[in-house]
Structure formats: C-alpha cells, structure tokens
Amino acid sequence: LRKKNGREKPWKVKYFGVGNENADILFVGEGPGENEDLQGEPFVGKAGQLLDKYLQVIGLSRDKNIYIANIVKCRPPQNRDPEQEEQDCCIEWLRAQTRIIKPQIIVCLGRIAAQKLISEDFKVTRQHGEFIKKGNILFMGTFHPAALLRNPANKPDTLFDFQSLRDKIKELKIEI
C-alpha cells in the first residue's frame, strides 16, 4: 500500500494513536496530515489545536482521559481523502485498538470516520451530534476540526456537539 502511494520509505508515523489507553472515550479522525506525519502523533497541527480547545471546554484532555486514533495510519498523497482500499487496509488496526481500549463512546471526527464506523450514508451536516448505539458502544459524528478551519460557520454546531458529549458522559457516569 505504501508503494502504491509513493511511500517507498518507512512510514514516518510512529504512533497509531495518542492518549490514555484505558480511556472510555475514543476520538477517531480520518488520517494524518503533514504535521502529524512529521511528528508521529494525531491532531498536532492547527486542526489539533482547535480540537484541544473543544476538549478543554468540556473537561477532556488527550493526555488524561481520551484516546485519539485515525482510520488510516499514514498520510495519503496530496492530503487527499483516503481511498476505500486504504481504509480497508488499516481498519483492522483500529478495530484492534478499539478492542484493547474498550471505549464506551467513539466520536467520529468528520465524514470519512463517520461513514466508516457509523454508516456508509452518514451525513455530518445532518446527523452531527446524534448518538447511535452499535453493540456496546455509543457513536457520535461531528465535524472534523480541519473542516471547521475551512468553514468556521459550523463551529457553533460543533461546540453544541461537544456539550452534548459532555452531557452524555455525565449521564453514563463516566469518570473523567
């Protein structure tokens, strides 16, 4: 797969995620961007800084009480959306992470993650902030922080989604 994507050299990504491996809340993004690829950690660029602000508002922290991972584990060329084949190649890694972490809630950041984990026809613009139970896990999709940087008009909706997440955490009596 790396050869197909012009990635003949070893991956720069050193980590498949970051955070508390015993977290009850798992955030899943699409894949690493340029900064993430260089630093080997998800959400470290401007989108990551925005995500950290939303987390802080509701009392969450990537260092303490959540885990962050991605659908794909290496950066697609030209920062394009990961192709289905790339997603399928990496999804077992995410499933293994989910089995190890055992989250109660998975927050899908953006369309790619939501369509891969919640429903193929998930529409972030219509279904963001909704909780959907699959097995023993509650899923919620919301806007990807990078999309918010491109379209700040969705920031209030995203804040509301995060506040709904905070309320769900309290309802489920999840210790944070």
Residue ranges and their predicted role:
Residues 1-176:
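A polyanion-binding, active-site-adjacent surface
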